[in-house]
Every structure is written in C-alpha cells, then in structure tokens.
Amino acid sequence: MGDVLVVFRVLPEDVDNDLSRLESKIREKLNGVCKINDIKTEEIGFGLKALNVQAIMPDEEGMADRVESILAGIEGVSQVDTKDISLI
C-alpha cells in the first residue's frame, strides 16, 4: 500500500481565534501520527477563515478518520471536514 494526501478544512470556534496558534496546536497534535505537507489559510467570508491542512499518511483503513478525530478534539476547533483524498 502507498500513501494518501488528505486535505482537511479546520474551522475555528470564533472569528477572533489566532490561526497561527491553532496551526501550532495542529502541528503538535499530529506529530508522529502523519506528516503535514502544508497548512494554508482560506477566506470563508464575513471575517471567518479556515485552515486547509494537507496531511500525508499511510493508505490504511480508518487512518483519515483517526486524524479527523484528533483535529476535532483540539481546543479552539469548531468543525473539521475532509475536503479531498488522493493516492500519492
């Protein structure tokens, strides 16, 4: 089996959340679980921004769900959606 690139959209709880601090928490929590390829800020509207987290992980059953659960459990995160999964 190979690896997959999964893109997660992470929405903060509040428009006033510090996204750089949230990005640091994401990197800390996912350290050792998967490799973070990139994290980009996405403008949603009305001042709301999301983080698009590109994570590389083994193509194993349940791995993307595990990472999504870890992201959802981070303080300051309101919602996590899986945007894209691609075999690499």
Swiss-Prot record:
Identification of the protein by name: Elongation factor 1-beta
Pfam families: EF1_GNE
Annotated SUPFAM superfamilies: eEF-1beta-like
Biological source species: Picrophilus torridus (strain ATCC 700027 / DSM 9790 / JCM 10055 / NBRC 100828 / KAW 2/3)
GO molecular function: translation elongation factor activity
Function text: Promotes the exchange of GDP for GTP in EF-1-alpha/GDP, thus allowing the regeneration of EF-1-alpha/GTP that could then be used to form the ternary complex EF-1-alpha/GTP/AAtRNA.
Gene symbol of the encoding locus: ef1b
Keyword list, A-Z: Elongation factor, Protein biosynthesis
UniProt similarity note: Belongs to the EF-1-beta/EF-1-delta family.
InterPro entries: eEF-1beta-like_sf (IPR036219), EF1B_bsu/dsu_GNE (IPR014038), Transl_elong_EF1B/ribsomal_bS6 (IPR014717), Transl_elong_EF1B_B_arc (IPR004542)
